[in-house]
Design a protein with these regions (language model features):
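Functional cores that coordinate and move charged inorganic groups
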Residues: 113-208
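C-terminal ends of transmembrane helices
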Residues: 44-60, 107-118, 161-172, 212, ...
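Alpha-helical transmembrane segments of multi-pass membrane proteins
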Residues: 1-10, 253
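Entry/N-cap segments of selected transmembrane alpha helices
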Residues: 53-80, 149-158, 259-285, 310-316
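Predominantly late transmembrane helices and immediately cytosolic-facing juxtamembrane segments
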Residues: 176-183, 187, 198-306
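Structural signature of hydrophobic alpha-helical transmembrane segments
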Residues: 31-43, 90-104, 145-158, 196, ...
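Short helical (or helix-break) motifs at transmembrane helix termini and adjacent helical loops
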Residues: 78-79, 98-124, 132-138, 286-289
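Interfacial helix-loop-helix linkers and transmembrane-helix boundary segments
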Residues: 32, 51-66, 90-92, 119-120, ...
Length: 316
């Protein structure tokens, strides 16, 4: 609404305010700080949730964990193929646009679904959205990057290896991993790769070992007074991510200027139709078909009670 109101100019000026992180030689607009910085916290929480499900939840078995992975492949491939079939030609470079899922939107859908979706389906959608998003980041890095800086890629790999070494040494101090996570974020940014990937990586690599549950009894049904570091951090960051980061992200990224000229141009554009068909038709159909084929081949197991309508809804 603001983007199409008299406040539009101030809105866009505000989002384009320059933020200088001179100590690490990084210049960001406010919009990029939100999308690259704050959203890293969101992705960290998502990574923690998936780690919890992989260790003791709905993704604990190999066949359960493989389900969102295989579904995501179909959900990326078919939209790209549909886009190429409709747009193609000189617009071939846009095939990656309908590939990605807006993970923040996916989480919003989970909230709206409430009790109508089982815990298993919610976990499936969350994992699917994360894999889909990571896939899109990798596609952009591999096919559309102007050239990643190898030295920073090596630094990023070093940060990931450092996490494994620290865990092997039994280091559990959270601030140590926070420092490594910051270094990983900087390395990915400097390498030309979307730095929010650092959040997912650090979330997935968080050690799932027991700590005291004092002051965190609301997080889990604790019987022995302990919970895992994953659960503790998830509880510590969840509210901040859900009630501050996501609303700010939505406010900053929903500013789409609408005009009759823009709408007419979109209607006449094969690129717009390719993106639309890829997302609206290709995404749910790709997820549905690959999931069904994988289940028939006994490669994966979908969440208990999953119906066809729910599977299509997940892809939408």
């Amino acid at each position: 609404l603001i983007a199409n109101s008299p406040l539009a100019e101030q809105y866009f000026k505000f989002l384009n305010l320059s933020l200088s992180l001179s100590f690490i030689s990084i210049e960001l607009t406010l919009l990029k700080f939100i999308n690259y910085g704050l959203m890293t916290i969101f992705f960290f929480v998502v990574g923690l949730e998936i780690k919890r499900e992989l260790t003791s939840g709905h993704l604990a078995s190999v066949r359960n964990a493989a389900a969102p992975f295989i579904a995501a492949i179909g959900g990326m491939a078919l939209p790209a193929l549909i886009y190429l079939a409709i747009a193609g030609g000189s617009a071939v470079q846009g095939w990656a646009i309908p590939v990605a899922t807006d993970i923040a939107l996916a989480v919003g859908i989970l909230v709206l679904m409430g009790e109508r979706a089982t815990d298993g389906m919610k976990t499936f959608l969350l994992a699917l959205a994360v894999i889909d998003d990571i896939g899109a980041i990798l596609i952009i890095a591999i096919f559309f990057s102007t050239g990643a800086i190898v030295s920073w890629l090596v630094a990023a790999l070093g940060a990931v290896l450092a996490v494994f070494v620290l865990q092997k040494l039994g280091v559990l101090q959270i601030y140590v991993y926070f420092i490594v996570g910051i270094l990983l974020w900087i390395s990915l940014y400097k390498a030309g790769i979307h730095p929010t990937l650092a959040g997912v990586i650090m979330g997935l690599l968080t050690p799932a070992v027991a700590v005291s549950a004092k002051n965190h009894e609301h997080l889990v049904d604790v019987e022995d007074g302990t919970l895992t570091i994953v659960e503790k951090l998830e509880g510590d960051f969840h509210r901040f991510s859900a009630f501050i980061v996501v609303p700010i992200f939505a406010f900053a990224n929903s500013g789409i200027e609408l005009s009759s000229a823009a709408i007419k141009a979109a209607i006449a554009s094969p690129i717009a139709w390719g993106i639309f068909a890829g997302l609206v038709i290709g995404k749910p159909l790709g997820i549905f078909l690959t999931s069904k084929v994988a289940v028939a081949a006994k490669l994966v197991e979908l969440p208990v009670g999953t119906k066809n309508q729910a599977l299509v809804a997940v892809g939408s």
